Amino acid sequence: MARITVEDCLEVVNNRFELVMMASKRARQLANGVQPLIENAAASDKPTVMALREIAARRIDNALIDEVEKAERERAEREALEWAAAEVVADEDMSKNDD
């Protein structure tokens, strides 16, 4: 697979700082299990390399990254609420058994 360079990505994202932010957010998403958007992603590629490949291929933008982050936050909040609700039920069951 061809080597990806920062210059390839700068053709898509004009600002180096923005490129670093976009690539780091996407790499974190990929490391957490989000599926890559490029078909020929090598299993040996690290998340950072995959993120740069996606940027260079124009598969992602800030809107997509924000959308994925929002979905992950909502999922985490839902899981936290479910866990808290289960704890409340367990506490109620324990207090009933103490009576």
Swiss-Prot record:
GO terms for biological process: DNA-templated transcription. GO terms for cellular component: DNA-directed RNA polymerase complex. Its EC number is 2.7.7.6. Keywords: DNA-directed RNA polymerase, Nucleotidyltransferase, Transcription, Transferase. InterPro entries: DNA-dir_RNA_pol_omega (IPR003716), Pol_omega/Rpo6/RPB6 (IPR006110), RPB6/omega-like_sf (IPR036161). GO terms for molecular function: DNA binding; DNA-directed RNA polymerase activity. Pfam families: RNA_pol_Rpb6. The keyword Methyltransferase does not apply. The RNAP catalytic core consists of 2 alpha, 1 beta, 1 beta' and 1 omega subunit. When a sigma factor is associated with the core the holoenzyme is formed, which can initiate transcription. Belongs to the RNA polymerase subunit omega family. This is DNA-directed RNA polymerase subunit omega. It comes from Xanthomonas oryzae pv. oryzae (strain KACC10331 / KXO85). The gene is rpoZ.
